[in-house]
């Protein structure tokens, strides 16, 4: 096991918060590992005066970080999963995610509590074509203007009257401790589906880095990891970019997704059974620090808490046509459900 890890991340305050949350998880399992944060300025951070769809999409927030990973200048990278394209360059992989935060969007406005309450021809600041499509579906009269920058800068623009309202992710507002219920109002899923992967912190590594893979196996939040599969499959199949209005949100239909799986042991083992069960549940592999022995691989059986419902949205390039679809599937076939939805909805949009 390595003694230190170089963690690549963007330099924004929110990205650094995300990175420290990952470090907290790593330290729980590997308290002696030294974690060095390597801040990286990305092209997406430098270009703030143009919408993302005009300059290469969200991948611009990853390009320099992924290159540092490929060049072995860093050992792992931390991203907001919503910024990660459906197709990841070889030999990189999303190997772990943290538990998902509430992925809803927030209507931010000083005078009004909802999009419906805004006066005729009001201006909403947003550069996301997904949000623009939903806004225009609810209120075609509203004007949507390009609105780039980090969370703090967008709120400052709102406060100075540059726009009448904006829409931001709840996760960022909460983690930056700037969610104010006086002018921040949660938007329900029925009105606006979130961005794919919204609310999820992702860890990217090189596939052949066994040391990082072992760490990721420990910190990975399995219920969230399974939950995002249909969303990501939908995104990957469509190879969607920032010009395409697209959204998806998955949730467990069962009451308690934390108790997602049970482990079936295939050989007699030695050691403290409680410690073994804990180690196996968290990583699905041996944990040499416990001194326990069991045959790998463990067979993972998904029980009743395994049904996922995913709501999908896809629009055409100008947002004039939007289609919705819902898939309910067993956890073992959730990826296929995302692909199925993509095929059906693409056909509907193209008609």
Swiss-Prot record:
Enzyme class: transferase
Pathway listed: Porphyrin-containing compound metabolism; protoporphyrin-IX biosynthesis; coproporphyrinogen-III from 5-aminolevulinate: step 2/4
Known cofactor(s): dipyrromethane
Keywords linked to the UniProt accession: Porphyrin biosynthesis, Transferase
GO BP terms: protoporphyrinogen IX biosynthetic process
Coiled coil stretches, renumbered: none
Any one GO cellular component localisation term in the record: cytoplasm
Matches recorded under SUPFAM superfamilies: Periplasmic binding protein-like II (SSF53850), Porphobilinogen deaminase (hydroxymethylbilane synthase), C-terminal domain (SSF54782)
InterPro entries: HemC (IPR000860), Porphobilin_deaminase_cofac_BS (IPR022419), Porphobilin_deaminase_N (IPR022417), Porphobilinogen_deaminase_C (IPR022418), Porphobilinogen_deaminase_C_sf (IPR036803), RPE1 (IPR005728)
Matching PROSITE patterns: PORPHOBILINOGEN_DEAM
A Pfam family the protein falls into: Porphobil_deamC
Gene Ontology MF terms in the entry: hydroxymethylbilane synthase activity
EC number: 2.5.1.61
Organism domain of life: Bacteria
Residues bearing the modification S-(dipyrrolylmethanemethyl)cysteine: 242
UniProt cofactor note: Binds 1 dipyrromethane group covalently.
Catalytic activity, reaction form: 4 porphobilinogen + H2O = hydroxymethylbilane + 4 NH4(+)
Self-association and partners: Monomer.
Protein task: Tetrapolymerization of the monopyrrole PBG into the hydroxymethylbilane pre-uroporphyrinogen in several discrete steps.
Family: Belongs to the HMBS family.
HAMAP family recorded: Porphobil_deam
Further information: The porphobilinogen subunits are added to the dipyrromethane group.
Name of the protein in question: Porphobilinogen deaminase
């Amino acid at each position: 096991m390595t003694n230190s890890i170089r963690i690549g991340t963007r330099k924004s305050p929110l990205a650094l918060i995300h990175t420290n949350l990952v470090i907290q998880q790593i330290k729980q399992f590997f308290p002696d590992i030294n974690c060095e944060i390597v801040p990286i300025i990305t092209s997406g951070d430098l270009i703030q005066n143009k919408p993302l769809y005009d300059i290469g999409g969200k991948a611009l927030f990853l390009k320099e970080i992924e290159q540092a990973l490929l060049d072995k200048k860093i050992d792992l990278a931390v991203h907001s999963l919503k910024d990660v394209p459906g197709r990841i360059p070889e030999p990189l992989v999303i190997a772990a995610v943290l538990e998902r935060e509430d992925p809803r969007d927030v209507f931010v406005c000083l005078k009004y509590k909802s999009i419906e309450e805004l006066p005729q021809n009001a201006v909403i600041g947003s550069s996301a074509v997904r949000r623009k499509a939903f806004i225009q579906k609810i209120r075609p009269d509203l004007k949507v203007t390009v609105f780039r920058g980090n969370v703090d800068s967008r709120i400052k623009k709102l406060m100075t009257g540059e726009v009448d309202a904006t829409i931001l992710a709840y996760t960022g507002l909460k983690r930056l401790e700037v969610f104010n219920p006086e002018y921040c109002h949660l938007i329900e899923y029925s009105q606006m589906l979130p961005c794919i992967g919204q609310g999820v912190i992702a860890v990217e590594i090189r596939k052949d880095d066994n040391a990082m893979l072992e760490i990721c196996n420990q910190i990975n939040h399995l219920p969230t990891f399974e939950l995002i599969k249909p969303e990501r499959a939908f995104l990957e199949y469509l190879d969607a970019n920032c010009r395409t209005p697209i959204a998806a949100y998955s949730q467990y239909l069962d009451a308690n997704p934390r108790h997602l799986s049970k482990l079936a042991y295939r050989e007699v083992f030695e050691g403290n059974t409680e410690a073994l069960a804990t180690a196996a549940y968290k990583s699905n592999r041996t944990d040499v620090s416990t001194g326990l022995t069991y045959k790998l691989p463990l067979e993972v059986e998904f029980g009743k808490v395994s049904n996922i419902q995913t709501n999908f949205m896809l629009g055409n390039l100008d947002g004039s046509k939007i289609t919705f679809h819902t898939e309910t599937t067993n956890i073992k076939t959730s990826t296929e459900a995302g692909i199925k939805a993509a095929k059906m909805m693409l056909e509907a949009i193209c008609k």
